[in-house]
Swiss-Prot record:
Its EC number is 3.1.-.-. Transmembrane segments: none annotated. May nick NmeAIP sequences that contain T/G mispairs resulting from m5C-deamination. If unrepaired, these mismatches can lead to C-to-T transition mutations. The very short patch (VSP) repair process counteracts the mutagenic process by repairing the mismatches in favor of the G-containing strand. This enzyme is an endonuclease that nicks double-stranded DNA within the sequence CCGG (C-methylation site unknown) next to the thymidine residue that is mismatched to 2'-deoxyguanosine. The incision is mismatch-dependent and strand-specific. Pfam families: Vsr. This is Type II nicking enzyme V.NmeAIP. It comes from Neisseria meningitidis serogroup A / serotype 4A (strain DSM 15465 / Z2491). It is an enzyme of class 3 (hydrolase). GO terms for biological process: mismatch repair. Belongs to the Vsr family.
Length: 140
């Protein structure tokens, strides 16, 4: 399928996509706050600027978009156009995250990843968020 935008228009559109304050991030943060957790968001003091840092529990949470991290769900596929570029980009994202997670674990943090697709369906979302709370509490 061809792109409906020109190359310059596509670049402009892609520049407007931000990596913070996504719907999945806001959903997870609101849930955690409602559950009584206090946290910092996108804390630059830690490698990889985790989406959520729960210092009291020595836990960081990353909320990953399935497309950007090549998740095995149906949203994690490589686009048919410019395949080499996207394959390289997504591979680098994954490699960088493995390195960052290793560094965070070395300094004593538990790393939890929540996938975007786990938050789409209400029943699955509820289960995932409840499991997240258990994972955080088990980290202590």
């Amino acid at each position: 399928m061809t792109d409906i935008f020109t190359t310059s228009k596509r670049s402009f559109v892609m520049l407007k996509i931000h990596s913070k304050e996504t719907k999945p991030e806001v959903l997870v943060r609101k849930f955690l706050f409602f559950q009584g957790f206090r946290y910092r968001k996108n804390d630059k003091r830690y490698v990889g600027k985790p989406d959520i840092v729960l210092s009291k529990y020595k836990t960081v949470v990353f909320i990953h978009g399935c497309f950007w991290y090549g998740h095995s769900c149906n949203k994690g596929h490589i686009p048919k156009s410019n395949t080499d570029f996207w394959l390289e980009k997504i591979t680098k994202n994954c490699e960088r995250d493995i390195k960052n997670e290793t560094e965070l674990e070395k300094i004593g943090f538990k790393v939890i990843v929540v996938w975007e697709c786990e938050l789409k369906n209400k029943a699955i979302c509820r289960e995932r968020l409840n499991r997240l709370v258990r994972e955080i509490k088990d980290a202590v």
